[in-house]
């Protein structure tokens, strides 16, 4: 269970982030790897203060739940980031003779977006709580999101980068948007026609079935021109900075009776964004019970990416 306090945020949206793999690791006392698609069976929200049906404050506790879009683009972008991270580590380890040099709980972990990165460790970064609202103990723990190091120039200067899935790169490339990076380095389709050679519209066989020369030219133009360009943006992939950089809303609703049950969805990497808008100035404690589907990965349904 997670808890959200909305004091002082009346009429404004409060954004929270949670990492299911992180929460599971803390409450189960063993590592749950992030590189999986975690299946959420259902979520239930409860609130201390809520709008009654017919009341003008009905939208007081509006909830949106969003995730990384479950697409081949996001999957390939994640895999490219993972392979870059892993291969670099392997190359360095090959140059050493020290056994067991890699950290015992090493795992490839990324942020949902750059805001998630900058909010990490703050009250915007949700952690599990018990029935009394006590946050899980994190003393002595180490949940470190992955970094990669690139060479800035031939002089040997290096740059360390965090990694996030959605949106633009951070300022000075402090964090790399994996989907944007994937799109920047991948060959794309052509938008022009495959050939511009002239066609003789008076050719006898070309005019078979056509009433006249003009009809043949029109039909041929439709055949060659319509749907020649792809049915999507050529240069920008969904999830980069110029094409739907936000997370995908998978559930939404209004807590108007003190309780809001929502259905299931799949959270890539177990990453979720929760947006809540409340009309109450006083502290409104909203609790979120996340029920995961049972499965074969340490008790939960979480297929490897």
Kindly label every feature range from the protein language model.
Residues 1-28, 303-304:
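N-terminal leader/pro-regions and domain N-caps
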Residues 32-39, 57-59, 266:
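Solvent-exposed loop and beta-edge segments used for protein-protein assembly and interaction
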Residues 24-30, 47-53:
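Short amphipathic, basic-aromatic surface patches that mediate peripheral association
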């Amino acid at each position: 269970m997670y808890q959200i306090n909305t004091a002082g945020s009346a009429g404004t949206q409060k954004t929270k982030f949670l990492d299911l793999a992180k929460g599971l690791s803390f409450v189960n006392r063993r590592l749950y790897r992030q590189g999986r698609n975690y299946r959420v069976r259902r979520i239930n929200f409860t609130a201390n203060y809520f709008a009654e049906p017919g009341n003008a404050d009905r939208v007081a506790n509006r909830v949106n739940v969003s995730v990384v879009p479950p697409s081949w683009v996001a999957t390939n972008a994640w895999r490219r980031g993972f392979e870059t991270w892993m291969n670099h580590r392997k190359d360095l380890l090959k140059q050493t003779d020290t056994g067991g040099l890699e950290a015992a709980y090493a795992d490839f972990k990324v942020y949902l977006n750059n805001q998630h990165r900058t909010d990490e460790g703050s009250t915007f970064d949700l952690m599990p709580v018990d029935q009394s609202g006590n946050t899980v103990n994190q003393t002595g723990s180490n949940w470190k999101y992955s970094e990669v190091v690139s060479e800035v120039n031939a002089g040997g200067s290096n740059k360390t980068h965090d990694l996030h899935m959605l949106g633009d790169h951070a300022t000075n490339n402090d964090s790399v948007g994996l989907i944007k990076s994937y799109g920047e380095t991948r060959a794309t389709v052509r938008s022009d026609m495959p050939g511009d050679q002239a066609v003789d519209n008076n050719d006898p066989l070309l005019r078979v079935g056509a009433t006249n020369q003009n009809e043949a030219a029109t039909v041929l133009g439709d055949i060659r021109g319509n749907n020649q360009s792809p049915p999507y943006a050529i240069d920008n992939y969904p999830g980069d900075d110029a094409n739907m950089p936000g997370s995908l809303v998978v559930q939404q609703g209004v807590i108007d009776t003190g309780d809001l049950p929502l259905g299931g969805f799949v959270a890539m990497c177990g990453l979720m964004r929760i947006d809540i808008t409340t009309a109450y100035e006083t502290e409104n404690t909203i609790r979120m019970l996340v029920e995961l589907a049972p499965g074969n990965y340490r008790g939960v349904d979480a297929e490897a990416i």
